[in-house]
């Protein structure tokens, strides 16, 4: 019996919500005490590129990528439930990081 911290990362907000709902549904079906999904701050990375390298210096283009994060904490999770949790089908495009907290 231990606490498990699951951190989800994705560039797509809808995809990360779908995966976090799957984890919540899993916890409710197995009667596991949990907290979350807790939305963590979204990291926004902006890149500015010159459109033309010579005369038109004022002409620039901006791109951004947003990394959405969620945190889910499961309490009193035994080894059998942890294995079942790891076997959950997760959409591609979502990074899942599982850590055990003592």
Swiss-Prot record:
Record-stated family: Belongs to the universal ribosomal protein uS10 family.
Keywords per UniProt: Ribonucleoprotein, Ribosomal protein
Pfam families for this protein: Ribosomal_S10
Biological processes, Gene Ontology terms: translation
Protein name: Small ribosomal subunit protein uS10
Xref: NCBIfam families: PRK00596.1, rpsJ_bact
Record's function text: Involved in the binding of tRNA to the ribosomes.
UniProt subunit comment: Part of the 30S ribosomal subunit.
PROSITE patterns: RIBOSOMAL_S10
Claim: Ribonucleoprotein is one of the keywords in the record: yes
A GO CC term attached to the entry: ribonucleoprotein complex
Annotated GO MF terms: structural constituent of ribosome; tRNA binding
């Amino acid at each position: 019996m231990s606490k498990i911290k699951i951190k989800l990362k994705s560039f797509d907000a809808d995809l990360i919500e779908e995966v976090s709902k799957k984890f919540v549904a899993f916890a409710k079906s197995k009667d596991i005490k949990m907290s979350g999904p807790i939305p963590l701050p979204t990291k926004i990375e902006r890149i500015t590129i010159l459109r033309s390298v010579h005369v038109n210096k004022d002409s620039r283009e901006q791109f951004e990528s947003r990394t959405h994060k969620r945190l889910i904490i499961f309490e009193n999770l035994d080894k059998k439930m942890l294995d079942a949790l790891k076997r959950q089908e997760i959409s591609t495009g979502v990074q899942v990081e599982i850590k055990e907290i003592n």
